[in-house]
């Protein structure tokens, strides 16, 4: 059986880790709507420390959106999208939904962010040219099968919409190559199995709920309140499918197969924010919590993923040189020196001003 290492504030398990051979490393991000603000905080800490040892990236819904910003090396981008755009009435409007429209307007969100703060896809293209891969998960509307898309400049924004199209709330779904897709969280909210299938030996998983927490999705609870029982009937099979797949994924994380190693970064308690309709103060608190958890991960696990452990144990004493120079490890508190986009509208420079005390 593999190994699961929980990483959250107050958990000392990462402190006892010894050097190991990580092999192929994957970064996997869970969806969760506005709860993705926690993931944004974690990934902003990674970017601040220039920490990116990953070979493979997989995300669903909000996780795919967060990873898009990370892969394009745009610190503060995801935070800005969640706090300044998803809180606007143009995006989330219950009255529009009652009148027969969409509860969430993904088209407005994608078009507004693309025009006002575009993703730096050229940066991502260079990453892909180096051999790294990024997959976004969306669910087929006809049979609920999860599909994993490699984004390109041409389809990137459409795949984000497909991966985030919450059933019922974005009524039409998203058509890709003639097939309708819905939110990838229906079938694969945390694509850890796909990461393992693609050869990853070490998984870093960022959750948006406390570990081992089984829950009914927030969007379904809201739908229960806003719609009558008769209107919910067509979605019963979909919800049951989601709950079954989510439990299966959770069990996979708790008991990884073979020699798989899973580092699970998660909030120590339920977040203040919810999937939709969160208040800005709640989002701000959860972002800070994500930053702190990201910093804790870097201080405990990060160096083990960037340093190569010896393949064999030497039987003869190693010769120690007269002087040893040890470069300082990347520290999350250091000033950001990574090259980022020079387009001010594409980043959020205020992300670095958060009070983390």
What are these regions (language model features)?
Residues 1-58, 68-357:
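Patatin-like phospholipase
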Residues 59, 63:
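Gly/Ala-rich beta-loop-alpha elbow adjacent to hydrolase catalytic centers
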């Amino acid at each position: 059986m593999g190994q699961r290492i929980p990483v959250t504030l107050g958990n000392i398990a990462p402190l006892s880790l010894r050097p190991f051979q990580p092999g192929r490393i994957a970064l996997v991000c869970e969806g969760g709507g506005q709860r993705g603000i926690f993931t944004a905080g974690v990934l902003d800490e990674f970017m601040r420390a220039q920490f990116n040892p990953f070979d493979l990236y997989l995300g669903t819904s909000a996780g795919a959106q967060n990873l898009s910003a990370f892969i394009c090396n745009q610190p503060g981008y995801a935070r800005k999208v969640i706090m300044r755009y998803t809180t606007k009435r143009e995006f989330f409007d219950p009255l529009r939904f009652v009148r027969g429209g969409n509860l969430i307007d993904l088209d407005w969100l994608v078009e507004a962010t693309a025009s006002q703060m575009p993703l730096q896809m050229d940066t991502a293209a260079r990453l892909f040219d180096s051999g790294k891969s990024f997959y976004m998960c969306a669910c087929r509307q006809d049979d609920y099968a999860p599909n994993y898309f490699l984004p390109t400049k041409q389809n990137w924004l459409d795949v984000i919409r497909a991966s985030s199209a919450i059933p019922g709330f974005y009524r039409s779904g998203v058509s890709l190559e003639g097939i309708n897709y819905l939110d990838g969280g229906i079938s694969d909210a945390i694509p850890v199995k796909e990461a393992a299938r693609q050869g990853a030996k070490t998984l870093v998983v960022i959750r948006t709920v406390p570990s081992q927490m089984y829950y009914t999705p927030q969007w379904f609870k809201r739908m229960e309140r806003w719609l009558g029982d008769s209107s919910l009937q067509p979605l019963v099979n979909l919800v049951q499918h989601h709950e079954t797949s989510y439990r299966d994924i959770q069990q996979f994380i708790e008991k990884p197969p073979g020699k798989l190693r899973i580092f699970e970064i998660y909030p120590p308690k339920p977040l203040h924010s919810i999937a939709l309709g969160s208040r800005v103060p709640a989002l701000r608190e959860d972002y800070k919590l994500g930053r702190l958890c990201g910093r804790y991960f870097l201080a405990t696990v990060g160096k083990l993923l960037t340093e190569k452990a010896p393949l064999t144990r030497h039987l003869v004493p190693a010769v120690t040189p007269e002087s040893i120079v040890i470069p300082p490890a990347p520290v999350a508190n250091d000033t950001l020196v990574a090259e980022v986009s020079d387009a001010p509208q594409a980043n959020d420079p205020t992300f670095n001003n958060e009070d983390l005390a």
